[in-house]
Amino acid sequence: MAKLSLIEREKKRAKLVAKYAEKRAALEAIVADQSKSEEERYEARLKLQALPRNANPTRQRNRCSITGRPRGTFRKFGLARNKLREIAFKGEIPGLTKASW
């Protein structure tokens, strides 16, 4: 089980990403737009840099929703590999079966 502080930190990052998503997208569009003047693009870059670091989605880490484990997490289920295995063997995930060929 991951430390509770690490799990809470990730939740805080997720909130910040959601809060600044529109603003970040607008600024990134201005920076990428070649038709804008150099000065406008520079100002947009400065505003983008002024946003909180944790508002950047690349700083988020996918964690298991049960244990908080940061590695070996399946995006589709939001679970770590070992918890996914336990739950799948109990038959609690509909349509998920062990591979057999």
Curated annotation (Swiss-Prot):
GO terms for molecular function: rRNA binding; structural constituent of ribosome. The keyword Cell membrane does not apply. One of its GO terms (cellular component) is small ribosomal subunit. Keywords: Ribonucleoprotein, Ribosomal protein, RNA-binding, rRNA-binding. It comes from the Bacteria. GO terms for biological process: translation. It holds the Pfam family Ribosomal_S14. InterPro entries: Ribosomal_uS14 (IPR001209), Ribosomal_uS14_bac/plastid (IPR023036). Part of the 30S ribosomal subunit. Contacts proteins S3 and S10. Binds 16S rRNA, required for the assembly of 30S particles and may also be responsible for determining the conformation of the 16S rRNA at the A site. Belongs to the universal ribosomal protein uS14 family. This is Small ribosomal subunit protein uS14. It comes from Ralstonia pickettii (strain 12J).
